[in-house]
Swiss-Prot record:
This is Period circadian protein. Residues 54-63 have a biased composition (Polar residues). Phosphorylated with a circadian rhythmicity, probably by the double-time protein (dbt). Phosphorylation could be implicated in the stability of per monomer and in the formation of heterodimer per-tim. Residues 9-31 have a biased composition (Low complexity). Coiled coil: none annotated. Its main location: nucleus.
Length: 63
């Protein structure tokens, strides 16, 4: 039970971080001036993409 609880907490934390990243990406896109920055952010997002997809789905289900 303890490990299960930890897993849930971890997922929630990841969801918060993902949301922050999304907001940051939106800001960068709106600026449009930081082209290189967007590229770097994109590569970082790709690595986080697989777990993020699951987290986003879980977040929607929780809501």
């Amino acid at each position: 039970e303890g490990s299960g609880g930890s897993g849930s907490s971890g997922n929630f934390t990841t969801g918060s971080n993902v949301r922050m990243s999304s907001v940051t990406n939106t800001s960068n896109t709106g600026t449009g001036t930081s082209g290189g920055g967007n590229s770097a952010a994109a590569s970082g997002a790709r690595h986080n993409a697989p777990p993020v997809s699951v987290t986003l789905t879980e977040s929607l289900l929780n809501k």
